């Protein structure tokens, strides 16, 4: 069946493309140096699209090579004299890592973007979906480590949009969850820049799917908290008394380095030391690791984990028995 399918695909592609596309490509190749007078990005892409799929085929059919070259010069003059299109920025969620979990809209915008400003945690396989000509700039942050200043990220967005670029601000997970989206929106609002927001699968959802559990369950928790392990001031304070109650569930982002602080606060406020915690490192990626620990063994369970992780407090994996970390006697005596 494979040859039949291949022939069908080949026939479908040939029917969609202009019959004279090969000749037009040869003519266009000789014109590329002149076309470089147009700004890089959308304007230049629109120029070539108009030639190959609109004006060029008709001119070539009517007048041959001379007609195609005439249209190229006419289009170049038209695009050079046209008012430049304003730039635009799309804030897009890259999801937890697996490229197949990207939304369709995210894939489309990845292919259209001129400049991609991406978080450090965005999977390389996702970045490979961008156009070859696109400019990729890592603007990542590392917890308690080196990071690009947020003001510098704002400047990069505004700078590239001012040049007429279609900018993709690609954020790991969902841009509205611990992604400092509001700050970037405020920066572009001051410049009257148009934008869109494309949601992605947040790490908590991917982590819950990985351990085979629901984030909410009747009779267990009527609330779900998404909390961060640290904020701009350091370790983040939470409503510890509420979190320490039986049945409380929270997805903890950026919690590895703050694990001992979180553990101490919860135990101090009366949390059951045996409260389950699921640890999902590199969620949805080939190197994904799932561990289960009781709250009193949390820091020990995290000791050799180097990748990004989400902690699901109050939730244990479906098959956790062989993965549960038990605290040492020294830990119990602290």
Describe these PLM feature segments:
Residues 10-14, 104-112, 130-135, 183-187, ...:
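Short, solvent-exposed amphipathic alpha-helical segments in soluble enzyme
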Residues 1-21, 202-206, 212, 309:
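Short alpha-helices
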Residues 26-89, 152, 162-167, 223, ...:
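A contiguous loop/helix-start segment that scaffolds small-molecule binding in enzyme catalytic cores
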């Amino acid at each position: 069946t494979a040859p039949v399918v291949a022939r069908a695909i080949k026939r479908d592609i040939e029917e969609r493309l202009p019959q004279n596309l090969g000749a037009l490509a040869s003519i266009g190749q000789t014109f590329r140096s002149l076309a470089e007078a147009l700004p890089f990005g959308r304007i230049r892409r629109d120029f070539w699209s108009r030639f190959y799929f609109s004006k060029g085929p008709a001119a070539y059919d009517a007048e041959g090579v001379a007609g195609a070259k005439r249209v190229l010069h006419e289009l170049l003059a038209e695009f050079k004299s046209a008012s430049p299109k304003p730039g635009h920025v799309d804030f897009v969620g890259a999801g937890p890592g697996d490229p197949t979990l990207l939304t369709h809209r995210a894939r489309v915008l990845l292919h259209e973007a001129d400049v991609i400003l991406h978080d450090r945690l965005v999977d390389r396989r996702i970045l490979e979906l961008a156009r070859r000509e696109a400019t990729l700039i890592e603007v990542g942050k590392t917890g308690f480590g080196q990071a690009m200043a947020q003001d510098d990220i704002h400047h990069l967005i505004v700078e590239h949009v001012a040049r007429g670029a279609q900018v993709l601000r690609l954020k790991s997970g969902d841009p509205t969850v611990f992604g400092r989206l509001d700050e970037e929106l405020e920066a572009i609002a001051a410049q009257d820049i148009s934008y869109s927001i494309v949601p992605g699968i947040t790490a908590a959802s991917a982590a819950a799917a990985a351990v085979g559990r629901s984030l909410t369950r009747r009779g267990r928790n009527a609330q779900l908290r998404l909390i961060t392990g640290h904020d701009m001031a350091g370790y983040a304070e939470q409503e510890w008394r509420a979190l320490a109650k039986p049945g409380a569930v929270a997805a903890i982002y950026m919690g590895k380095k703050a694990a001992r602080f979180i553990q101490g606060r919860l135990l101090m406020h009366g949390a059951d030391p045996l409260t389950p915690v699921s640890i999902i490192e590199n969620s949805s990626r080939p190197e994904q690791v799932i561990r289960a620990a009781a709250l009193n063994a949390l820091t020990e369970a995290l000791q050799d984990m180097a990748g990004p992780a989400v902690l699901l407090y109050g939730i244990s994996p479906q098959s956790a028995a062989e993965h549960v970390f038990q605290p040492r006697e020294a830990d119990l005596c602290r």
